[in-house]
């Protein structure tokens, strides 16, 4: 089931959490809401769940207006960062909880509940642990129980609020791959909040980048990384070098060299050029002359910090499959093979 967000606004006293959000979440996709603290990503997720209500705008589940629906009526599965498991209940009882609290005709017979619980424990790879209690499980196992509990009620939508934030790095990496497999098997429309770029880019079909209550860009992980739509996205997702320049009669000039001007850039004025470290390449003849400040090898990759000659501007370069060593004071020529250009605040 798809979700449509239309002109959603939310204010907390003097703080604007959401400022007119429009977003279409496709049926069956895994969408990441990525942004810094205070960007509005968790507020948006909670409004989709029905845990918060917007001041203005609408939330549609398919063609159904869910804006004023209760949490129960929306039938969403929700997984929190800190598990929210019942400590006094076994794994089995935690997963069965949402099914047992149903009333009337919606209540399943115990045999059906039991079958569903064991089906889910198998899905999340916790077979044989149904009688354990949360305190007897690792952090990764607890999060799997939380996901099984969310799936037990057969939700129309699955929502996850920084589900791996409390876990160590290796467990997070393992669970990311596992969650992607679970999503592909269930086909549920899934929205998850994260501030971890790597997590969003590895897991999601699409990423929505939020900043100060607004969406900066919605695109595939590759497009968000390779073709950011704004200076904020360039700066927030991945490492980037920023260099001032200008667009004039002679074209785009940055730090003393003329570069090809992107066709979408119309007008003249001061600009900022954004180029990722891996997109600065060595060139024997053309480009900026730079002086090495330091270098650091990490396996086959080499990271080099250099200062552009006759300039105070420093850049970071990442060279893959590098065989040469680079020493302080060594001179290099650099050319950007791929970059973004935006008018600066003073020039646009």
Curated annotation (Swiss-Prot):
Top-level taxon of the source organism: Bacteria
Gene3D superfamilies in the cross-refs: P-loop containing nucleotide triphosphate hydrolases (3.40.50.300)
Organism per entry: Xylella fastidiosa (strain 9a5c)
Catalytic activity: sulfate(out) + ATP + H2O = sulfate(in) + ADP + phosphate + H(+); thiosulfate(out) + ATP + H2O = thiosulfate(in) + ADP + phosphate + H(+)
Protein family membership: Belongs to the ABC transporter superfamily. Sulfate/tungstate importer (TC 3.A.1.6) family.
Localisation: Cell inner membrane
Upper classification of the organism: Bacteria, Pseudomonadati, Pseudomonadota, Gammaproteobacteria, Lysobacterales
ABC transporter domain boundaries: 3-237
GO molecular function: ABC-type sulfate transporter activity; ABC-type thiosulfate transporter activity; ATP binding; ATP hydrolysis activity
Subunit: The complex is composed of two ATP-binding proteins (CysA), two transmembrane proteins (CysT and CysW) and a solute-binding protein (CysP).
Name of the protein described by the UniProt record: Sulfate/thiosulfate import ATP-binding protein CysA
EC number: 7.3.2.3
Membrane topology value: Peripheral membrane protein
Keywords (A to Z) from UniProt: ATP-binding, Cell inner membrane, Cell membrane, Membrane, Nucleotide-binding, Sulfate transport, Translocase, Transport
């Amino acid at each position: 089931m798809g979700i449509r967000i239309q002109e959603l606004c939310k204010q907390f006293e003097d703080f604007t959490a959401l400022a007119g959000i429009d977003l279409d979440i496709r049926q069956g996709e895994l969408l990441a809401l990525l942004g810094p603290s205070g960007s509005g990503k968790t507020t948006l997720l909670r409004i989709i769940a029905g845990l918060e209500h917007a001041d203005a705008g609408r939330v549609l589940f398919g063609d159904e207006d869910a804006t004023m629906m209760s949490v129960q009526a929306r039938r969403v599965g929700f997984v929190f960062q800190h598990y929210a498991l019942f400590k006094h209940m076994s794994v089995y009882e935690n997963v069965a909880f949402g099914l047992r609290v149903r009333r009337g005709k919606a209540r399943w017979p115990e045999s059906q509940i039991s079958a569903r619980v064991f089906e889910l424990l198998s899905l999340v790879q916790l077979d044989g642990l149904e009688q354990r209690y949360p305190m007897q499980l690792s952090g990764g196992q607890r999060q799997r129980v939380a996901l099984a509990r969310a799936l037990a009620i057969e939700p129309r939508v699955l929502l996850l609020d920084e589900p791996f934030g409390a876990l160590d790095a290796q467990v997070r990496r393992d669970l990311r791959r596992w969650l992607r497999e679970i999503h592909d098997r269930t086909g549920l429309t899934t929205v998850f909040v994260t501030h971890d770029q790597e997590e969003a880019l590895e897991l999601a079909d699409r990423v929505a980048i939020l900043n100060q209550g607004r969406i900066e860009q919605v695109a595939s992980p590759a497009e968000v990384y390779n073709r950011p739509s704004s200076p904020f996205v360039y700066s927030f997702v991945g490492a980037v070098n920023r260099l001032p320049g200008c667009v004039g009669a002679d074209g785009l000039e940055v730090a003393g060299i003329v570069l090809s001007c992107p066709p979408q850039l119309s007008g003249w004025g001061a600009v900022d050029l954004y180029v990722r470290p891996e997109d600065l390449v060595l060139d024997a003849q053309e480009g900026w002359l730079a002086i090495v400040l330091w270098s650091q090898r990490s396996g086959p990759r080499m990271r080099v910090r250099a200062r552009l000659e006759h300039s105070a501007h420093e850049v970071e370069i990442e060279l893959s499959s590098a065989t040469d060593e680079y020493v302080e004071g060594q001179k290099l020529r650099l050319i950007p093979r791929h970059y973004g250009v935006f008018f600066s605040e003073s020039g646009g």
